[in-house]
Each structure stands twice: as structure tokens, then as C-alpha cells.
Amino acid sequence: MSLLGAAAAGWGLVEAGRPRLRELELAVPGLPPELDGLRIVHLSDFHLGVPSPGVLAVERAVSWTAGRRPDLVAITGDLLTRPSGEPRLRRLVERLPGPTFAVLGNHDLAIARDPLARPSALLELSPARLLSDEGELLELRGKAVWVAGTDPRMLFRRGTKTDPNSLSREAGLRILLCHFPRVLDRLEPGRFELVLSGHMHDGQISVPYPGGKVRLAHPSAPYASGVYRSRAGTMHVSPGLGTTFIPFRFAARPEATELVLRSA
């Protein structure tokens, strides 16, 4: 058993540094025809500042993103576990192409159970736009696109009680970035067409079985990774790129996803 455990841990270290880099076509109800084919690279959960093979996954994902040259890049929180990762984070963000938007996560503010986490003083992330209960209007392919992002404390109710519905504006496409997937349960229909989230790491350590797997982190969570739909809109939950608590993944490979939006 000790050999089996060592082999599993060894593979977990390898898996944590080998991101899946994939394209996913995503039907979005209400998407204007002009935005059919719009490409968004969704990245999440870098967790920089602690030793982890996840750093390799982040580096590889950023290089891949730069080569894809999408219309938009979205980063949905937990950029840092410790402030010491900030210089690397800034170098990585400078390599990302086109408009890039990001939000913070609970690890960025150290409102997490992770004993390694320390709060960072990240207030801006130029050339990316760091959103905190605010949004920005931009024009893509001749249509107005509204990108909004939440402060992660919105769902912890620590220091802010912003209603995510209040962040919506009129636009051809409205996108909400929130670290926590359960924001979908708070949204009213017609506020946002697309929600992008992270946080879950697809369990980070999972036990596969035929037809599925048991996620050891958040085993009963309604949103783990992938695409979810409700009356409030369409949500993509990223498996993320880094690690927390322990520096490996098992049956929960890190991922960078290029979403190709399609009119439903």
C-alpha cells in the first residue's frame, strides 16, 4: 500500500503541472448573431506564491493563451495564495493578449481555511482590468459587451453586501466574473447571459469510478467544473490551474479553456 500511495502522490505531482488546454463550443441563449464565434479564454485559480507544480500549469496556460489570441481573457480569482507570488503574476498578465479582466478570490484576501494563505494588497493588475463590484463596457465585433466582476466577500458577507444583480447593464452580451459558482443561485433571469467562475478545482483530489468520480473537496457541491444552465443563464466553472493545501492533483487535471460562443 505504501508503494501504491507513493505512486499516486508522484502522479499527482505530475498531473498538477500538466494542464489540459482545450476549446469548448458553448451555446449561449440570447447571444447576438454578430457575436457568434466570439472566443473567450477562461483561466482561474493560479494560487501563486507557494511551491507547487501548479506554477508550471499556469505558465503553460498563459503561453497557450497568448498563441490563441482570443477576443477576451477572463481570470476568475485566487490569483495568489501569498503576496510573494505577485511579481510572477504581473509578468504572466503582461503576456496575455487582448482585453483581460480578472476578479479576486478568497485566497487573495486570505478568507480561506488554507493555513498557507496570506492576504495580498492587490488593488490593480495592469494591463488587465481588476474588477471589484463593477464592470466595463467594451465593443467586440461591433456589439456592446458588458463585463462585470464581484468582490469575493460578496458571498462571504464580509465588508460588502453588493447584490450581483445590480452589476448588470444593457448590452448585447453581459458577462459576470465571480470566483464562487454559487453566485448563479443569486442571479435573476435576464441579468447576465454568461457567468464565469472557479474556486472548486474540480475537487483537486478525486477518486474515479466507471461513469464518474468522487471529489474529495466539496463532494456535495452542486457546481464542480464544466457548464451549467439555469433560468438565470449559462455558467462555466473552470477546474483552475493551481493547487491549495497540498501541491498535487489526482483525477482533477488543471485546465485552461477557450470558450467559443455560439448563438443558441
Predicted regions and their residues:
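N-terminal membrane-anchoring alpha-helices
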Residues: M1-E34
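Soluble catalytic domains of enzymes that build or remodel membrane lipids, polysaccharides, and related
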Residues: E34-L43, L48-A264
